[in-house]
């Protein structure tokens, strides 16, 4: 009798696991192995997204349009937790990106936005530097190079408000956040 109850409980767990909707997760890969890992995961039947951007690479004798990963050493997989081991076992996968020790799921909306960004012809530059309100920053590129002030607000990727101490004024700059650095 106990055996049947345990078997039914296990069947319920299996049914619950089978009906879990897959979610997107970021996977960290070995350096420069993104395309290889992408291909291997596709072969395993795993829904995979590798954001690539087109850029010109210049050699001494020629210029060539190439596709390179937008986020170095990262790809995205859409899986259910049961498939985590399948992803882990894929050669070139280092680990899942985690939050509090668990693989961190990424909302579908963020993946959709990333796809839109890749499909647009916008020039994309990625920075890992995080700016917060109150940071002292310096403009390191563009026509305002050398400008130093306090970051008041960021309004997306291309709009920042910087307060210049001596003028007691706020300047709204329409520049990429990548043109700033913390000081």
For each feature predicted by the language model, list its residue ranges.
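Acidic-enriched and Gly/Ser
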Residues: 2-136, 161-183
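A generic structural signal for beta-strand entry/edge sites
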Residues: 157-159
């Amino acid at each position: 009798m106990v055996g049947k109850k345990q078997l039914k409980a296990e069947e319920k767990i299996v049914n619950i696991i089978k009906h879990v909707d897959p979610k997107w997760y970021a996977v960290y890969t070995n350096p420069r192995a993104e395309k290889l890992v992408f291909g291997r995961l596709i072969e395993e039947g795993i829904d995979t997204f590798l954001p690539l951007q087109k850029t010109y690479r210049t050699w001494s004798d020629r210029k060539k349009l190439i596709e390179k990963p937008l986020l170095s050493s990262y790809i995205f997989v859409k899986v259910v937790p049961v498939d985590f081991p399948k992803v882990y076992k894929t050669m070139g996968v280092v680990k899942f990106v985690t939050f509090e020790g668990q693989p961190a799921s990424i909302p579908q909306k963020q993946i959709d936005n990333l796809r839109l960004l890749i499909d647009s012809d916008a020039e994309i530059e990625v920075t890992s530097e995080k700016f917060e309100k109150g940071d002292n920053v310096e403009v390191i590129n563009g026509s305002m190079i050398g400008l130093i002030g306090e970051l008041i607000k960021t309004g997306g990727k291309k709009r920042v408000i910087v307060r210049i101490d001596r003028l007691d004024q706020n300047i709204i700059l329409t520049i990429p956040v990548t043109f700033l650095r913390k000081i």
